[in-house]
């Protein structure tokens, strides 16, 4: 049975999505021209849900990160739904050792009294939020980005609290972000830090996983979000990898249109169609989007869709995606492209169900924590913390430890998702009034955001 793609929701309905109130009875024409009104207090709870949902998905996905990347032997025997709850299998990083996070492929949860540790899916976004607040700006300069990275990220050529890895001292940066940081330490400013002549990893996934939050800083206004995210994206990516990051930023901005009281699947497909308009025709991200969507609409299982992605892009190198021809480590398993396609599998087939989306993303393969964390944050922001806890049937920790991977923050790096959400309101206030041409009604505690 074919699944239908519904048209995009009128943007004016996002006020109700943010507040949980009933939808207004207004004409379609009025809905298309009326400014967006969003309750600030309710949106702070959405931001709290973003951090919590992202952390659950990140840590669950880390259990299977790089277990299955294609090729010969066990690493090419992809997981299926039957593997959920079963013992984790070794990754390419340590072929003789399963995950130290969890012995089984299952949800990783932190309950009150515990803390969520930072990872590269959350820590760069935390740094950017802090920098925007520190400088009281909506658009970070090259110098501000460089200084924030240097202030809060360890230099892997010097001792760190985390020991060593195969490239030096552990600093929890990889591929393009690591090279960008090295260039910053040498005095280079973004966007030259992603120049292919200086950074050979510019096609990797780094920019996507470190910039999605900018979409949430500009609710309902992807145009504003993309201006805010432009330089952070180009800090680590160029070309198609940057386009993929822009898609995710726009998707997060458009999520303000989603009504959590209605089925999420059709609404998520609708906003994805809008965000996909940013993907240039004739390039592989647009082709990947259409291919995965066609697999979903055909009635294929998610495993069949994932296997088709592997065959089409990693084996056959269709639609201009030729990473496999370059002899890269792990066949480009960190690349923005293959992980974009794999992530779309969990996005469409998860149909807006947080648990199902995390399950599929965790089992889909490749850099499985990154796309999964993206969707956990997106869906978590729509749900809010209370609904996330209801979905998992248990109270969950709101404590966050940024110093698991980074440095230089107050309180030895311990923070709280609710406080992080509250702090983000100042960023959004500035973006609404300064970048979007909107206003803040303090009496009603709402943003009034005009349409672009």
Language-model regions: role of each:
Residues 1-4:
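Positively charged n-region of N-terminal signal peptides that target proteins for export
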Residues 35-38, 172, 176-204, 211-222, ...:
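Accessory "access/gating" subregions that flank catalytic or transport cores
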Residues 56, 60, 67-89, 237-240, ...:
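Catalytic phosphate/nucleotide-handling subdomain of diverse soluble enzymes
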Residues 62-109, 122-124, 143-163:
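Active-site-surrounding "flap" and adjacent substrate/cofactor-binding loops of secreted or lumenal enzymes
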Residues 282, 286, 290-324, 329, ...:
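Acidic, carboxylate-rich catalytic segments that either coordinate divalent cations
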């Amino acid at each position: 049975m074919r699944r239908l793609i519904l048209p995009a929701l009128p943007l004016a309905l996002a006020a109700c999505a943010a507040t949980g109130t009933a939808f207004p009875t207004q004409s379609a024409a009025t809905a298309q021209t009326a400014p967006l009104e969003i309750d600030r207090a309710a949106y702070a709870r959405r931001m709290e849900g973003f951090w919590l949902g992202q952390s659950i998905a990140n840590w669950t996905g880390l259990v299977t990160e790089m277990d299955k990347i294609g090729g010969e032997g066990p690493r090419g025997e992809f997981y299926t739904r039957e593997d959920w709850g079963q013992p984790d299998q070794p990754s390419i990083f340590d072929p003789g050792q399963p995950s130290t996070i969890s012995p089984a492929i299952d949800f990783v949860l932190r309950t009150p009294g515990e803390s969520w540790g930072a990872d590269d899916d959350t820590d760069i976004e935390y740094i950017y939020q802090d920098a925007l607040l520190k400088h009281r700006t909506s658009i970070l300069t090259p110098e501000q980005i460089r200084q924030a990275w240097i202030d809060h990220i360890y230099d892997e050529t010097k001792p760190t609290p985390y020991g060593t890895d195969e490239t030096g001292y552990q600093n929890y940066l990889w591929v393009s972000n690591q090279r960008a940081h090295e260039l910053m330490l040498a005095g280079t400013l973004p966007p030259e830090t992603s120049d292919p002549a200086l950074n050979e990893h510019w096609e990797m996934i780094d920019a996507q996983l470190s910039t999605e939050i900018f979409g949430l800083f500009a609710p309902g206004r992807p145009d504003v979000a993309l201006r805010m995210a432009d330089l952070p994206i180009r800090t680590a990516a160029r070309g198609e990898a940057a386009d993929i990051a822009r898609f995710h930023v726009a998707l997060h901005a458009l999520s303000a249109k989603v009504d959590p009281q209605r089925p999420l699947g059709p609404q998520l497909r609708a906003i994805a169609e809008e965000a996909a308009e940013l993907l240039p025709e004739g390039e592989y991200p647009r082709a990947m989007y259409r291919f995965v969507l066609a697999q979903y609409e055909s009635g294929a299982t998610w495993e069949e869709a994932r296997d088709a992605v592997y065959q089409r892009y990693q084996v056959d190198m269709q639609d201009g995606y030729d990473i496999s021809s370059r002899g890269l480590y792990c066949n480009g398993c960190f690349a923005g492209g293959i992980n974009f396609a794999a992530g779309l599998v969990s996005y469409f087939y998860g149909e807006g169900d947080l648990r199902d989306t995390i399950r599929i993303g965790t089992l889909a393969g490749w850099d499985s924590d990154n796309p999964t964390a993206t969707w956990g944050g997106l869906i978590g922001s729509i749900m809010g913390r209370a609904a996330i806890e209801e979905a998992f049937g248990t109270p969950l920790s709101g404590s966050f430890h940024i110093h698991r991977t980074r440095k230089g923050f107050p309180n030895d790096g311990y923070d709280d998702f609710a406080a992080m959400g509250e702090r983000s309101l100042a960023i959004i206030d500035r973006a609404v009034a300064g970048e979007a041409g909107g206003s803040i009604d303090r009496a009603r505690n709402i943003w009034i955001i005009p349409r672009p």
